[in-house]
């Protein structure tokens, strides 16, 4: 069972900024994470607001500032951070964002420490605060004219900021317009700009301030499809993505639906996955001096490299520059002029055949991020294994790995070099967000519960490198246990649904660890919109499937929301860039549009479920893993909701129209039923079942059923009630979903392939409900003739466990560290099959009558928006954080 976390301190606020409060720094913090791994962080633990991605140390070492993105957007200021009793300000103090506090993933102190420069993100400004009293001193917009430069920029997104060593110049990264704006620090005026490559992320200056470096973590610039207009989406948008990636069509363009779709260009050009170097000695006339492509070459061949290296962190010494490659688990040492890679360091601790993929390559998943230099060593945040790697800066040999918190993102040092500071984006997890032990007045939304942290680690107190490595290894392998061999099957089905916790659907299952008082979508459920709508059988089919087959009551999603969830469930660990994008987007501070003039506002803002080329791990996701095996796959609706789309009335059967030349992963492009809808809550899941059955029968008759079949059933996401369309309650969407699920298993269990199949059902995330164990606990059903009937697994499992089990059932090797280090879904499989079919359970027509269900016909813009938003974070947060009397079983049900 996941460990329950102690609540972090929330401070009382006054005026613009909160009062400081002394809080004991914790030591000996331990936790079990949703992915089943453990953390045993070194040093002192200081709680911060959720999702901190950066930090800055004041030059005198007396203070640290760290911005948090999302829930709320906050500025954390820690005074005396190396002391056992640091003083912490969190601004704002509560769980709600304050419009006056704008932050993103970068800030910097002035040379004398009297000012803090803060990049504000979506508003495109650099704002300064006086550190003496934390009042605003001044601000400057990155928008507007710059003398002797091109037309004034608009739509800037201020991502991070650096101060020159002499304190006279600021360099602000504009992710909207893909440029760096040079500012006079004293006057806070724009004086120059320089272009960057695709999706710039990290900035660093050489120690003498003569050179500036930027990492470009993207690959392409996505452009609007010619003739496409968001004013006439049905008539001008594409019905289906234009091409697969990588491919000749993606590079050069193609004619699709009578439209000439522009290509994306060379996936191996230096505009992306690169380090660009600039001469900034003349700050009014900076110039690019080197553009260096990093990482392995992307190839258009099954089983090869498909993802960019995702250059992320960057730091410079006098004679070299160091860059972390998030997708390749490396730090590279580059000549100071930025023109050549000198050497590289492989970071993974995991070696041997057990940690190799089917082609003998090392499993990726260390996910190196932020960097720091100190005393001839490079320190790198290893976001994927909850550690800080330490390298010898000259030889690039790994010296040690230091255990820290969940998802470390940035590292820095005290000026005296004695203390290492690390911000842990997800801290130690969320803990429960419902049930009798949860304070109904406390936050319930996962984004508000998942407090970040600062690890303050005195280097002199660290144990030996061997002991540190053993702690990191043991923590990351905590979920692995010896299990009996699984049967070898021919077909695995993966059904991906939306947003539900375990308790709100299956909390009423006897013999399992559930809270029936939270089971609003169970067999004795209720509709919150109407007090008399009680004793509803919302999910009779899921409950019947659980009784006949197997489930877990100790399964957790790795994700927080749908944006990262649809990546995690396909074996993609989101990059640091993506995590900063979705958190700012879900927090309501990242405006985007397919028709935006700014390339950085058209795509990669974390608002869609489909992986873009920039998301692709080096060797791909589960899609490429299966395709490389030659066993084949089929896709019904998953991974199609690309950036630059609109889900709207009249777009069926596909459910959307597309406005950007965004590609699909090639295996998805080649294996998708193009009549099956993607996410669109105006389309009943009954229609999805009908289309699945139609297409699948054809393939079944032809004997063309592949190894992996992925099915998206999204309507348990819920939306506003539509009584006229057959959805009188939010619970009606869940009941629609349940009936479609039952129909699919009823159909498949009577086919000839059932005896060779396993059927997995899970959610993309658990953000839409509450749970008495953990906000990440969710649903995992396994239906197969080969499971022990009625089994409830209590083993700790996660999304990687599903991938791992599919790998083993199909006779494949592991894909990456996410599945290799995940707990196996063991103890549920049997040596002999149980071949009885599943019998469909009828819906409770009080909550959902399939005969009345129809495509949505929204009458207002608000109704239309409710059907197309894959996640409206504000709406979900309000729903989840309703009073206990609403989310718990009504008194009439007790």
Question: What is each residue range found by the language model?
Answer:
Residues 59-60, 111-112, 165-166, 207-209, ...:
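Residue-level detector of Asp-centered blade-edge/turn motifs that repeat once per structural unit
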Residues 465-894:
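N-terminal pro-sequences and low-complexity stem/linker regions of secreted or lumenal proteins
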Residues 69-70, 121, 175, 217-219, ...:
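Short loop/turn segments immediately following the C-termini of beta-strands
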Residues 44, 89-99, 138-153, 283-307, ...:
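Surface-exposed loop and turn segments in beta-propeller and other repeat-based domains
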Residues 23-41, 464-475:
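Blade/loop signatures of beta-propeller domains
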Residues 67, 215-272, 425-449:
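Short, conserved, GDST-rich strand-edge loop motifs in beta-rich repeat architectures
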């Amino acid at each position: 069972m996941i460990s329950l976390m102690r609540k972090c301190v929330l401070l009382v606020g006054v005026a613009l900024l909160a009062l400081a409060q002394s809080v004991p720094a914790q030591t000996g913090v331990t936790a079990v994470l949703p992915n089943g791994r453990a953390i045993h962080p070194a040093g002192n633990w200081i709680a911060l607001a959720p999702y901190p991605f950066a930090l800055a140390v004041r030059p005198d070492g007396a203070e640290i500032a760290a911005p948090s993105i999302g829930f709320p957007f906050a500025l954390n200021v820690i005074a005396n951070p190396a002391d056992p009793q640091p003083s912490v300000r969190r601004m704002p103090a509560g769980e709600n964002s304050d419009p006056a506090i704008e932050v993103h993933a970068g800030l910097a102190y002035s040379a004398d420490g009297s000012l803090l420069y803060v990049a504000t993100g979506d508003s495109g400004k650099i704002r300064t605060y006086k550190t003496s009293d934390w009042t605003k001193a001044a601000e400057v917009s990155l928008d507007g004219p710059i003398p002797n430069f091109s037309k004034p920029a608009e739509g800037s997104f201020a991502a991070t900021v650096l101060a020159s060593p002499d304190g006279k110049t600021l360099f602000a990264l504009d992710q909207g317009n893909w440029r760096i704006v040079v500012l006079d620090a004293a006057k806070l005026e724009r004086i120059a700009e320089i272009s960057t490559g695709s999706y710039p992320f990290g900035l660093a200056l050489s120690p003498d301030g003569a050179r500036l470096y930027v990492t470009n973590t993207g690959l392409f610039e996505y452009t609007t499809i010619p003739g496409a207009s968001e004013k006439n989406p049905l008539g001008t948008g594409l019905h289906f993505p234009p091409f697969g990636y990588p491919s000749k069509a993606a590079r050069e363009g193609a004619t699709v639906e009578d439209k000439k779709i522009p290509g994306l260009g060379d996936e191996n050009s230096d505009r992306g996955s690169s380090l660009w170097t600039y001469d900034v000695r003349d700050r009014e006339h900076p110039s690019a001096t080197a553009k260096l492509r990093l990482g392995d070459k992307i190839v258009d061949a099954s089983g090869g490299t498909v993802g960019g290296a995702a250059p992320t962190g960057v730091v410079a010494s006098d004679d070299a520059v160091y860059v972390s490659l998030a997708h390749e688990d490396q730090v590279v040492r580059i000549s100071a002029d930025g023109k050549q890679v000198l050497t590289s360091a492989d970071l993974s601790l995991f070696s041997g055949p057990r940690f190799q993929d089917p082609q003998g390559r090392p499993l990726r998943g260390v996910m190196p991020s932020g960097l720091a230099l100190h005393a001839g060593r490079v320190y790198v945040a290893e976001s994927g294994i909850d550690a800080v790697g330490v390298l010898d800066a000259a030889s690039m040999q790994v010296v040690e790995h230091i255990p820290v918190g969940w998802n470390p993102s940035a590292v820095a040092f005290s000026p005296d070099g004695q203390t290492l500071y690390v911000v842990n984006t997800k801290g130690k997890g969320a803990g429960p967000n419902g049930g009798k032990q949860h304070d109904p007045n406390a936050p319930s939304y996962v984004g508000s519960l998942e407090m970040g942290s600062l690890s303050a680690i005195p280097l002199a107190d660290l144990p030996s490198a061997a002991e540190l490595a053993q702690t990191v290894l043991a923590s990351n392998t905590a979920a692995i246990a010896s299990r009996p061999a699984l049967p070898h099957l021919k077909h695995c089905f993966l059904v991906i649904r939306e947003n539900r916790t375990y308790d709100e659907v299956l909390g009423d299952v006897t013999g399992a660890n559930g809270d029936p008082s939270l089971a609003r979508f169970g067999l004795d459920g209720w509709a919150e919109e109407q007090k008399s709508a009680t004793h509803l059988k919302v999910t009779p089919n899921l409950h019947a499937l659980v009784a006949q087959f197997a489930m877990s009551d100790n399964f957790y999603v790795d994700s927080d929301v749908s944006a990262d969830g649809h990546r995690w469930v396909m074996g993609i660990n989101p990059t640091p860039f993506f995590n900063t994008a979705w958190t700012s987007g879900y927090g309501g501070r990242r405006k985007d549009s397919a028709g935006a003039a700014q390339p950085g506002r058209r795509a990669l803002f974390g608002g869609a479920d489909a992986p873009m080329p920039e998301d692709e791990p080096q060797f791909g996701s589960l899609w490429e893993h299966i395709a490389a095996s030659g066993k084949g796959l089929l896709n019904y609706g998953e991974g199609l909701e690309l950036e630059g789309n609109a889900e709207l009335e009249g777009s069926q059967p596909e459910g959307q129209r597309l406005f950007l030349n965004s590609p699909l992963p090639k295996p998805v492009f080649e294996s998708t039923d193009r009549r099956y809808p993607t996410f669109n809550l105006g389309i009943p899941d009954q229609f999805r079942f009908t289309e699945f059955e139609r297409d699948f029968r054809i393939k079944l008759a032809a004997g063309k059923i592949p190894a992996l079949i992925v099915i998206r059933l999204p309507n348990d996401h819920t939306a506003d009630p539509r009584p006229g369309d057959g959805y009188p309650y939010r619970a009606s969407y869940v009941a629609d979903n349940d009936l479609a699920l039952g129909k699919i298993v009823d159909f498949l269990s009577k086919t000839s392939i059932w005896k060779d199949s396993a059927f997995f059902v899970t959610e993309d995330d658990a953000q839409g409900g509450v749970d008495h164990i953990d906000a990440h606990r969710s649903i995992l059903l396994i239906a197969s003739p080969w499971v022990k009937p009625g089994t409830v697994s209590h083993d700790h499992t996660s999304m990687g466990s599903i991938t791992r089990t599919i790998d083993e059932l199909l006779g494949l090797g592991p894909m990456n560290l996410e599945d290799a280090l995940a707990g196996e879904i063991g103890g549920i499989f049997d040596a002999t099959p149980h071949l009885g079919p599943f019998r469909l359970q009828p819906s409770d027509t009080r909550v959902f009558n399939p005969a009345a269900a129809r495509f949505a016909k929204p009458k207002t813009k608000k109704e239309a928006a409710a059907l197309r938003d894959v996640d409206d974070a504000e709406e979900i947060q309000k729903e989840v954080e309703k009073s206990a009397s609403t989310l718990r079983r009504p008194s009439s049900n007790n």
